[in-house]
Regions:
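Short alpha-helical oligomerization interface
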Residues: 117-126
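Conserved glycine-rich Rossmann-like NAD(P)H-binding loop of the short-chain dehydrogenase/reductase
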Residues: 53-68
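Flexible cofactor-recognition loop at the NAD(P)H-binding site
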Residues: 40, 113-116
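N-terminal Rossmann-fold NAD(P) dinucleotide-binding loop
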Residues: 43-44
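Rossmann-fold scaffold of SDR-type NAD(P)-dependent oxidoreductases
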Residues: 36, 105-113
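Conserved glycine-rich cofactor-binding loop
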Residues: 32, 39-40
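The beta1-alpha1 cofactor-binding region of Rossmann-like NAD(H)/NADP(H)-dependent oxidoreductases
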Residues: 81-96
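Non-catalytic terminal and boundary segments that flank Rossmann-like NAD(P)-dependent oxidoreductase
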Residues: 1-32
């Protein structure tokens, strides 16, 4: 139960704000970001804006061929690595690989879309 009504944050940004507007004047040099769903729609533009602000962006992808094509010239190919969020083993493999060569993660954008499928459980109980 929510004890208080939600209140607007009055940031000046809204549904029609572009990622480049939100990041205008912000220097993200030396920062590392991971954008799930970073190769489609809003995710592509978010990845682009973060790179333009100086950020090193990683875009894990279920369909790496599509991601490589969509993010060509934006995100380096070596930063596009296979990860299927619906597969815990794939996620763990990504985490193991990512954490073995990236010292820190400054920004995490959980942008990947999910489909409302019938509830299922993994062997681990998720």
């Amino acid at each position: 139960m929510i004890s208080e009504q939600q209140k607007p944050v009055n940031s000046g940004f809204g549904a029609k704000s572009e990622p480049t507007e939100v990041l205008a004047g912000i220097d993200l040099s030396g920062k590392t970001a991971l954008v799930t769903g970073g190769y489609s729609g809003i995710g592509t533009e978010t990845s682009r804006a973060l790179v333009e602000a100086g950020c090193e962006v990683y875009a894990p992808a279920r369909r790496t061929d599509v991601a490589l094509n969509e993010l060509e010239g934006i995100v380096p190919a070596e930063n596009i690595v296979e990860m299927d969020l619906a597969n815990p083993i794939s996620v763990q493999n990504f985490v193991d690989d990512f954490s073995s060569h990236v010292n820190k993660l400054d920004i995490l954008i959980n942008n990947a879309g999910v489909m409302a499928c019938p509830e299922m459980r993994t062997p681990e109980g998720w």
